């Protein structure tokens, strides 16, 4: 049975969301077992079977629109029409039955919806995209006001495991000096709290209903894939859609 995480947040009627783990698939080590990424060296047949299992377990209404994630800040608006390019790190939809999805294996997945249950979005926020403003870009796609938007921070590398160089801290502080509170000195490096950085960025644009942000992909090795921990590994995915 594919093990899914159902976000704990006050979802409005008409919105559904879930996030995958590494449990319940058919892939062999080091992709064991519910690897959803077709780009990381796994057997394509295994990936296809894993996706089928996930879609069934999550009761997805259609195949997700998979993005070509590039650690940027572009948002793809899902219209149901053919896309000239899927190079983006977030997707937005106001169409029922269209599934927004992002893949991660340490980077932060963020799911959005508005209280009225008419708009949703999914974001892949690695530190580069987060620093560049992918969350702000996504919020700006919503017709609704930021105060009516809810955000869920999915499983990412935790604050005790995410070691970065001084240049990462400096990049965030160049945008917002308050970001310094999310970094703790660790030898000649820093430990970064990607959840705190995301909360700061969201609060800065008026999104204050923020949930999740309490898991660690790096330390919870039985449950999650982690690129930083294992290098060659699988990918989880987070999904949200209008019913």
UniProtKB/Swiss-Prot annotation:
Cofactors that this protein relies on: Zn(2+)
Q: Mind listing the GO molecular function terms for this protein?
A: adenosine deaminase activity; copper ion binding; oxidoreductase activity; S-methyl-5-thioadenosine phosphorylase activity
Q: Which Gene3D superfamilies match?
A: CNF1/YfiH-like putative cysteine hydrolases
Q: Detail which positions bind Zn(2+).
A: 71, 107, 124
* Keyword tags: Copper, Hydrolase, Metal-binding, Oxidoreductase, Transferase, Zinc
What's its EC? 2.4.2.1, 3.5.4.4, 2.4.2.28
Disulphide bonds in the chain: none
Keyword Transcription annotated: no
Q: Which family does it belong to?
A: Belongs to the purine nucleoside phosphorylase YfiH/LACC1 family.
Q: What does this protein do?
A: Purine nucleoside enzyme that catalyzes the phosphorolysis of adenosine and inosine nucleosides, yielding D-ribose 1-phosphate and the respective free bases, adenine and hypoxanthine. Also catalyzes the phosphorolysis of S-methyl-5'-thioadenosine into adenine and S-methyl-5-thio-alpha-D-ribose 1-phosphate. Also has adenosine deaminase activity.
- According to UniProt, the name of this protein is Purine nucleoside phosphorylase YfiH
């Amino acid at each position: 049975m594919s093990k899914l995480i159902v976000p704990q947040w006050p979802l409005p009627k008409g919105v559904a969301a879930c996030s995958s783990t590494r449990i319940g698939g058919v892939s062999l080590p080091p992709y064991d077992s519910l690897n959803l990424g077709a780009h990381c060296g796994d057997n394509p047949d295994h990936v296809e079977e894993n996706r089928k299992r996930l879609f069934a377990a999550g009761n997805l209404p259609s195949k997700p629109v998979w993005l070509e994630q590039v650690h940027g800040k572009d948002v793809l608006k899902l219209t149901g029409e053919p896309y000239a390019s899927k190079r983006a790190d977030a997707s937005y939809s106001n169409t029922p039955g269209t599934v927004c999805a992002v893949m991660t294996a340490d980077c932060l997945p963020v799911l959005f919806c508005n209280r009225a249950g008419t708009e949703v979005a999914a974001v892949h926020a690695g530190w580069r995209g987060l620093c560049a403003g992918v969350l702000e870009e996504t919020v700006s796609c919503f017709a609704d006001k930021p105060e009516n938007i809810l955000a869920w921070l999915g499983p990412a590398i935790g604050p005790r495991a995410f070691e970065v160089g001084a240049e990462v801290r400096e990049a965030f502080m160049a945008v917002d000096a308050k970001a310094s509170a999310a970094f703790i000195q660790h030898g000649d490096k820093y430990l970064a709290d990607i959840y705190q950085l995301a909360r700061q960025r969201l609060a800065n644009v008026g999104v204050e209903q923020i949930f999740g942000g309490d898991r660690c992909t790096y330390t919870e090795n039985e449950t999650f894939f982690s690129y930083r921990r294992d290098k060659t590994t699988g990918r989880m995915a987070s999904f949200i859609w209008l019913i």
